[in-house]
Amino acid sequence: MLRLTKMLYQTSGDMAYMDYYERALYNHILSSQNPVQGGLVYFTPMRSGHYRVYSQPQSCFWCCVGSGMENHAKYGEMIYASRKDELIVNMFISSVLEWKEYGMTFTQETSFPEKESTRMVLHTDKSKKMKVSFRCPEWIDKSKVAFAVNGKKAEATLTDGYYTIERKWQDGDAIEMTLPMTLRAVQLPDKSSYYSFMYGPIVLAADMGKERLDGQFADDSR
């Protein structure tokens, strides 16, 4: 789905596709690999109280393992986009972008989603007038969004789902954006009676122990 989402965004520029991409990245791709023994799995149960069954490194190998490894290369794939004289920040992920056409480097520093902010530092060979736009995600509290440039409050224009700051940028300029998250109940896409609780783009889950969680790791019959 992320491949399709990527192509639809590149064709339309619709920010809504990046909302979906972000949600899938954090809640599906990130959790598709077991953090302890490295097993992989695609299937993500939507039913309350259910769990995943991961592969085991030495006894299981199926499509979830082979193509599942590729998924984790997507963390850096859609962080940025660009138009003429405009850099677009779609994902709030620590990263470094070298924009060779403009002789500029952008360093994004963030602990999102643990902290509700991100910081972008620009390095450039010479001053450059251009736009820097940040995605306005569906989950954000717009009334509390704030920007600062070099520590001073800055105004950003919200257009077509993006906050934009346009100015003449100097080497070392830094942009800070607050990312105020909200807690909400979201009905599942099938319009069933099931809801997920989300904080920002993150689906919340509770540790319910391991009772009756048999077969969390697949055996060699699969």
Task: Give the location of each predicted region.
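Glycine/proline-rich low-complexity spacer/linker segments in large multi-domain proteins
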Residues: 179-222
